Amino acid sequence: MRIAIYPGTFDPVTNGHLDILKRATEFFDEVIVAVAVDSNKTTLFSLEERIQLLETAAEELSQVKIRGFEGLTVEFARQCGANAIIRGLRAMQDFEYEFQLALMNKKLAADIETIFLMTQSEFSFISSSSIKWAASLKGNISEFVPPHVERAIYKKYHPEIDD
């Protein structure tokens, strides 16, 4: 069985993340979305909330599982029996960072490959940070995230607004 993990903080999950996830399922029997606990980042959503948002977003993808993790990505990959790490790339800036990360992961776990998938052009500018920024200013984010994620973000930033 070919198993990959797709790690990230997913705060929040975006349509760009989902595009990479759907495309990854074409290459692997199982893709585990590895939702990271990152003590270096302040997240809008708790780990449990991020997992729930992803489970709802990926409910039609039968070979996808969602799990939280803390620690080294390659160690989590080993625990899951995965032999690949999926990473999405939007631009050159992503590549430089991701390339360094992939080299470090290869040194730590030579048996685990990092596979880069380029985002579709319509998602190349989307980031969780920019979506949160726009939502905090009551901007329209409906084309960047699934509807349930949009509602959850607005509830966080603007609890006074009804659905």
UniProtKB/Swiss-Prot annotation:
Keyword rRNA processing: no
InterPro entries, per the entry: Cyt_trans-like (IPR004821), PPAT (IPR001980), Rossmann-like_a/b/a_fold (IPR014729)
Primary localisation category: cytoplasm
Site, Transition state stabilizer: residue positions: H17
Keywords: ATP-binding, Coenzyme A biosynthesis, Cytoplasm, Magnesium, Nucleotide-binding, Nucleotidyltransferase, Transferase
Binding site for ATP: T9, F10, H17, G88, L89, R90, E98, F123, S124, F125, I126, S127, S128, S129
Pathway recorded for this protein: Cofactor biosynthesis; coenzyme A biosynthesis; CoA from (R)-pantothenate: step 4/5
Record-linked Gene3D superfamilies: HUPs
GO biological process, one term: coenzyme A biosynthetic process
Catalysed reaction, written as an equation: (R)-4'-phosphopantetheine + ATP + H(+) = 3'-dephospho-CoA + diphosphate
Annotated GO CC locations: cytoplasm
E.C. no: 2.7.7.3
GO-annotated molecular function: ATP binding; pantetheine-phosphate adenylyltransferase activity
Residue sites binding substrate per the record: T9, K41, T73, R87
Compartments it resides in: Cytoplasm
Cofactor(s) of this protein: Mg(2+)
Assembly: Homohexamer.
Family under the similarity heading: Belongs to the bacterial CoaD family.
Function: Reversibly transfers an adenylyl group from ATP to 4'-phosphopantetheine, yielding dephospho-CoA (dPCoA) and pyrophosphate.
Protein name: Phosphopantetheine adenylyltransferase
Organism listed in the record: Desulfitobacterium hafniense (strain Y51)
Gene (name only): coaD
